[in-house]
Amino acid sequence: MHILVLGAAGMVGRKLTERLLRDGRLGNSDITRMTLQDVVAPAAAKAGFPVDIVAGDFAVAGFAEKLVADRPDVVFHLAAIVSGEAELDFDKGYRINLDGTRMLLDAIRLAGGGYKPRVVFTSSIAVFGAPFPDAIGDEFFHTPLLSYGTQKAIGELLLADYTRRGFMDGIGIRLPTICIRPGLPNKAASGFFSNILREPLAGKEVVLPVSEDVRHWHATPRSAVGFLLHAATMDSTAVGPRRNLTMPGLSATVGEQIAALKRVAGDTVAARIKREPDPFIMGIVDGWPRNFDAKRALQLGFTTAEKTFDDIIRIHIEDELGGKFVA
């Protein structure tokens, strides 16, 4: 099996790649080749099969055709400009998140010869906009309030239509906000959800730009990888024509996050959080969904690695900090 990962240098892309390289299999099939793409070269990888490293912008004309020329069996489309950056740079957001996605799907469509890969597309809960019900189900209509959400919503429609026409076997998964993200902060407007936990655990002070009553939907990197692997191997006939699914997660307020941090790591760690409201971030967060009913995804076999927000913090300490944090 040949696997292509677009956006392989990003956090979720790296985690997915590490898991695939470690397992050497996807479902019941041995991996025989992997292609890892990003705008910057993903890290070189050692494996018992060829691993091609490709650096380049997949939204440049002709680039996607090169990526699918060898007909990968599974395509993980993780490449995207994140929410805050897409809002600040309108042209860049649409070029990457919309035009790039269309170019990739068209490259697959035009490959011909009966080529029909499984395409796993990472969408976002940002496709939904206020006003919200208490818990948002898959049937809730798309009214995104950000450019990023609009781009992802259009990507969902394209994926469903190209699948309906028989050009690919697509599954779109709406990821919760991933928490706790390892590494340095990125330009995602949601980054503070991870920052206020990751930085204090590393002994650093951090700014909280919103109020503690802000509620949001979260899942760990470990769960995100599990979602992607299940989407790539599940029986897609059970999904039917509604090809995009909201992934399960945990709904929690910022205050509940901080309370969990205190329980797991102590008051001294939580005291490193400094409250400094940011009107730009607050304006974006006001239009975000807060809670979901992921019943359909659960019925189709998607599961999370965490059951409580304490678990989210413990998983980060275990996976990223070697089991230790700065008290």
Model segments located where?
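Mid/C-terminal beta-alpha module of Rossmann-like enzyme folds, strongest
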Residues: 200, 223-282, 325-327
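Conserved Rossmann-fold NAD(P)-dependent oxidoreductase catalytic core, especially the SDR/UDP-sugar
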Residues: 102-146
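N-terminal Rossmann NAD(P)H-binding glycine-rich loop of SDR-like oxidoreductase domains
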Residues: 1-26
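Amphipathic terminal alpha-helices
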Residues: 277, 289-295, 299, 303-327
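Active-site Tyr-X1-5-Lys
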Residues: 130, 145-171
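NAD(P)H-binding glycine-rich loop region in Rossmannoid oxidoreductase-like domains
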Residues: 58-96
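NAD(P)-dependent short-chain dehydrogenase/reductase
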Residues: 160-215, 221-226
